[in-house]
Amino acid sequence: MSKEVLNQTKEKMEKAVQAYGRELATVRAGRANASLLDKVTVDYYGAQTPLNQIASITVPEARMLIITPYDKTAIGDIEKSIQKSDLGITPTSDGNVIRIAIPALTEERRKELVKVVRKYSEEAKVAVRNVRRDANDELKKLEKNGEITEDELRSSTEDVQKLTDEYVAKIDDVMKDKEKEIMEV
Protein backbone atom coordinates (compact mmCIF):
# COMPACT_ATOMS: atom_id res chain seq x y z
CA MET A 1 0.00 0.00 0.00
CA SER A 2 2.80 2.44 0.84
CA LYS A 3 4.47 1.62 -2.52
CA GLU A 4 1.30 2.78 -4.24
CA VAL A 5 1.42 6.09 -2.35
CA LEU A 6 5.12 6.49 -3.28
CA ASN A 7 4.41 5.84 -6.96
CA GLN A 8 1.56 8.38 -6.97
CA THR A 9 3.80 10.87 -5.19
CA LYS A 10 6.59 10.43 -7.72
CA GLU A 11 4.12 10.86 -10.59
CA LYS A 12 2.66 14.06 -9.10
CA MET A 13 6.12 15.51 -8.43
CA GLU A 14 7.16 14.71 -12.00
CA LYS A 15 4.06 16.54 -13.28
CA ALA A 16 4.93 19.57 -11.11
CA VAL A 17 8.44 19.69 -12.61
CA GLN A 18 7.04 19.33 -16.15
CA ALA A 19 4.58 22.17 -15.54
CA TYR A 20 7.50 24.26 -14.27
CA GLY A 21 9.43 23.48 -17.48
CA ARG A 22 6.48 24.63 -19.60
CA GLU A 23 6.22 27.79 -17.49
CA LEU A 24 9.93 28.55 -18.04
CA ALA A 25 9.59 28.06 -21.79
CA THR A 26 7.44 31.19 -21.88
CA VAL A 27 10.22 33.30 -20.33
CA ARG A 28 12.05 35.16 -23.08
CA ALA A 29 15.81 34.58 -23.16
CA GLY A 30 16.81 36.83 -26.07
CA ARG A 31 16.16 34.24 -28.77
CA ALA A 32 12.98 33.80 -30.78
CA ASN A 33 10.93 30.81 -29.70
CA ALA A 34 7.30 30.08 -30.60
CA SER A 35 6.58 29.04 -27.00
CA LEU A 36 7.10 32.68 -25.95
CA LEU A 37 3.56 33.31 -27.13
CA ASP A 38 1.97 30.28 -25.42
CA LYS A 39 0.32 32.41 -22.74
CA VAL A 40 -1.02 35.04 -25.15
CA THR A 41 -4.78 34.86 -25.57
CA VAL A 42 -6.72 36.85 -28.14
CA ASP A 43 -10.26 38.19 -27.86
CA TYR A 44 -11.54 36.31 -30.92
CA TYR A 45 -15.26 36.74 -31.59
CA GLY A 46 -15.89 37.41 -27.91
CA ALA A 47 -13.92 34.44 -26.55
CA GLN A 48 -10.40 34.43 -25.12
CA THR A 49 -8.61 32.07 -27.51
CA PRO A 50 -4.96 30.96 -27.30
CA LEU A 51 -2.95 32.62 -30.08
CA ASN A 52 -1.58 29.30 -31.35
CA GLN A 53 -5.16 28.17 -32.11
CA ILE A 54 -5.95 31.06 -34.45
CA ALA A 55 -2.56 31.56 -36.12
CA SER A 56 0.59 29.71 -37.10
CA ILE A 57 3.79 30.88 -35.44
CA THR A 58 7.11 30.37 -37.21
CA VAL A 59 10.71 31.24 -36.37
CA PRO A 60 12.47 32.16 -39.64
CA GLU A 61 15.61 33.43 -37.89
CA ALA A 62 17.15 33.67 -34.40
CA ARG A 63 15.52 36.98 -33.44
CA MET A 64 12.30 36.97 -35.49
CA LEU A 65 8.85 35.45 -35.07
CA ILE A 66 6.23 35.48 -37.82
CA ILE A 67 2.57 35.04 -36.96
CA THR A 68 0.25 34.13 -39.83
CA PRO A 69 -3.40 34.33 -38.72
CA TYR A 70 -5.79 31.80 -40.23
CA ASP A 71 -8.37 34.63 -40.31
CA LYS A 72 -6.86 37.91 -41.56
CA THR A 73 -9.53 39.96 -39.75
CA ALA A 74 -7.98 38.94 -36.42
CA ILE A 75 -4.66 40.71 -37.10
CA GLY A 76 -5.58 43.83 -35.10
CA ASP A 77 -6.77 41.81 -32.10
CA ILE A 78 -3.64 39.65 -32.19
CA GLU A 79 -1.41 42.74 -32.23
CA LYS A 80 -3.28 44.25 -29.26
CA SER A 81 -3.00 41.02 -27.27
CA ILE A 82 0.75 40.78 -27.86
CA GLN A 83 1.24 44.42 -26.84
CA LYS A 84 -0.80 43.86 -23.66
CA SER A 85 1.25 40.79 -22.71
CA ASP A 86 4.18 41.39 -20.37
CA LEU A 87 6.72 40.09 -22.89
CA GLY A 88 8.18 43.48 -23.75
CA ILE A 89 7.94 42.89 -27.52
CA THR A 90 6.27 45.01 -30.19
CA PRO A 91 4.50 43.45 -33.18
CA THR A 92 4.48 45.00 -36.67
CA SER A 93 1.94 44.04 -39.30
CA ASP A 94 1.76 44.32 -43.07
CA GLY A 95 -1.91 43.27 -43.26
CA ASN A 96 -1.17 39.59 -43.95
CA VAL A 97 1.36 38.57 -41.31
CA ILE A 98 2.62 39.94 -38.02
CA ARG A 99 6.37 40.15 -37.50
CA ILE A 100 7.94 40.33 -34.09
CA ALA A 101 11.60 41.30 -33.88
CA ILE A 102 12.99 40.00 -30.61
CA PRO A 103 15.28 42.75 -29.29
CA ALA A 104 18.45 41.94 -27.42
CA LEU A 105 17.80 41.99 -23.70
CA THR A 106 19.06 44.90 -21.65
CA GLU A 107 20.91 44.15 -18.41
CA GLU A 108 17.94 45.48 -16.44
CA ARG A 109 15.46 43.28 -18.32
CA ARG A 110 17.72 40.24 -17.82
CA LYS A 111 17.68 40.81 -14.06
CA GLU A 112 13.87 41.15 -14.11
CA LEU A 113 13.60 37.87 -16.02
CA VAL A 114 15.89 36.13 -13.52
CA LYS A 115 13.51 37.28 -10.76
CA VAL A 116 10.57 35.85 -12.71
CA VAL A 117 12.43 32.55 -13.15
CA ARG A 118 13.16 32.41 -9.41
CA LYS A 119 9.49 33.11 -8.64
CA TYR A 120 8.41 30.24 -10.92
CA SER A 121 11.03 28.02 -9.27
CA GLU A 122 9.70 28.80 -5.82
CA GLU A 123 6.14 28.06 -6.98
CA ALA A 124 7.29 24.70 -8.37
CA LYS A 125 9.07 23.86 -5.11
CA VAL A 126 5.92 24.72 -3.16
CA ALA A 127 3.94 22.40 -5.47
CA VAL A 128 6.43 19.57 -4.81
CA ARG A 129 6.27 20.20 -1.05
CA ASN A 130 2.46 20.14 -1.18
CA VAL A 131 2.66 16.73 -2.86
CA ARG A 132 4.99 15.62 -0.04
CA ARG A 133 2.53 16.85 2.59
CA ASP A 134 -0.37 15.04 0.90
CA ALA A 135 1.67 11.82 0.67
CA ASN A 136 2.68 12.00 4.34
CA ASP A 137 -0.96 12.61 5.34
CA GLU A 138 -2.02 9.60 3.28
CA LEU A 139 0.68 7.42 4.88
CA LYS A 140 -0.36 8.52 8.39
CA LYS A 141 -3.96 7.66 7.54
CA LEU A 142 -2.87 4.18 6.38
CA GLU A 143 -0.92 3.67 9.62
CA LYS A 144 -3.86 4.87 11.72
CA ASN A 145 -6.16 2.40 9.92
CA GLY A 146 -3.67 -0.39 10.60
CA GLU A 147 -2.85 -0.96 6.91
CA ILE A 148 0.87 -0.29 7.47
CA THR A 149 3.09 -0.53 10.57
CA GLU A 150 4.81 2.36 12.33
CA ASP A 151 8.16 1.20 10.91
CA GLU A 152 6.72 1.17 7.38
CA LEU A 153 5.35 4.66 8.02
CA ARG A 154 8.77 5.95 9.08
CA SER A 155 10.51 4.25 6.14
CA SER A 156 7.94 5.51 3.63
CA THR A 157 8.09 9.03 5.05
CA GLU A 158 11.86 8.99 4.57
CA ASP A 159 11.38 7.78 0.98
CA VAL A 160 8.92 10.62 0.33
CA GLN A 161 11.48 13.10 1.71
CA LYS A 162 14.17 11.65 -0.59
CA LEU A 163 11.83 12.09 -3.56
CA THR A 164 11.10 15.66 -2.47
CA ASP A 165 14.82 16.45 -2.21
CA GLU A 166 15.44 14.88 -5.63
CA TYR A 167 12.72 16.93 -7.36
CA VAL A 168 13.66 20.18 -5.59
CA ALA A 169 17.24 19.60 -6.82
CA LYS A 170 15.91 19.09 -10.37
CA ILE A 171 14.02 22.38 -10.13
CA ASP A 172 17.19 24.14 -8.91
CA ASP A 173 19.22 22.68 -11.80
CA VAL A 174 16.66 23.80 -14.38
CA MET A 175 16.53 27.25 -12.75
CA LYS A 176 20.33 27.64 -12.88
CA ASP A 177 20.40 26.62 -16.55
CA LYS A 178 17.64 29.11 -17.42
CA GLU A 179 19.36 31.90 -15.46
CA LYS A 180 22.61 31.18 -17.30
CA GLU A 181 20.73 31.27 -20.63
CA ILE A 182 19.12 34.61 -19.73
CA MET A 183 22.33 36.26 -18.51
CA GLU A 184 24.24 35.13 -21.64
CA VAL A 185 24.88 38.16 -23.85
Curated annotation (Swiss-Prot):
Any Pfam family: RRF
InterPro entries recorded: Ribosome_recyc_fac (IPR002661), Ribosome_recyc_fac_dom (IPR023584), RRF_sf (IPR036191)
GO MF term list: ribosomal large subunit binding
Keyword Repressor: no
SUPFAM superfamilies the UniProt entry points to: Ribosome recycling factor, RRF
Keywords assigned: Cytoplasm, Protein biosynthesis
Superkingdom classification of source: Bacteria
Family: Belongs to the RRF family.
Name of the protein this chain belongs to: Ribosome-recycling factor
